Amino acid sequence: MNNILVINNEIKDYENEYLSIVNNNITFKKNCDYSIYYENCNNVNISINLLDNVYVKLFEYMCDLEVESNIVYNISDSATLLLFKFYANKNVYENVVINLNGYMAKVNYNFSNICIGEEKYKFIINHNNSNSISDISNKSLCLEKGKIDFDIDTVLEKGNIKCSMNQDTKIINFGNNKSVIKPNMYIDVDDVSARHSSVIGNFSEEELFYLMSRGINYNDSIKLLVKGYIFSNLVVDMDKRSKILNIINKYWR
């Protein structure tokens, strides 16, 4: 199993042919598939670096924590990060910085979470080179006492041409939650493809009616929609899927 454990805010130094870890800096040297699990953390600071021409599929998992985290992703020439991330925490304040430093650097960031307490996510995506691509997808379920805030900045400065950027953030509320999405794109170039979408709401009555018309009761219908929503943003193996299903079953019985 290619697992990286962040325990008490620290990662043990380690090196193999695919990666090196020194002082909470993870550097991927070859194409690989890894998972990061956060345990007993409250103040996380890590850097994740992809060298030239490296393709990394990464899964991040964090559950039942009260945590402040700062995570920086640095992506070099022709490197690609495919990230799937699942959180279900008590309270979170997270800063995410994605630096697309290389020519044709690419990130595909897919985040699903269950918001139980108070959460704030600040994203800064820097397109620091030409032909770089960012695709950011956030899907959150905000429970009755939850409160969530997404602040997302995509930055493209003059001189970096033919870039593509996308922000897609959706929050499903259960109750009268205070949820906020602030999508921002700061672009100083004409030759660019840029798109953002922000939605805050509930599961549609049509979806619920369809499921209930098939003989599924209300609670089970909601649970099916929750599962579909969470997993629509994640590509994970059966072990990870089972772990996430256990969390879903905890809140939707």
Language model regions located:
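Conserved beta-strand/loop scaffold segments within soluble protein domains that form the structured core
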Residues: 2-209, 213-216, 230-231, 238-253
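Short alpha-helical scaffolding segments that buttress acidic/His motifs in well-ordered protein cores
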Residues: 224-225
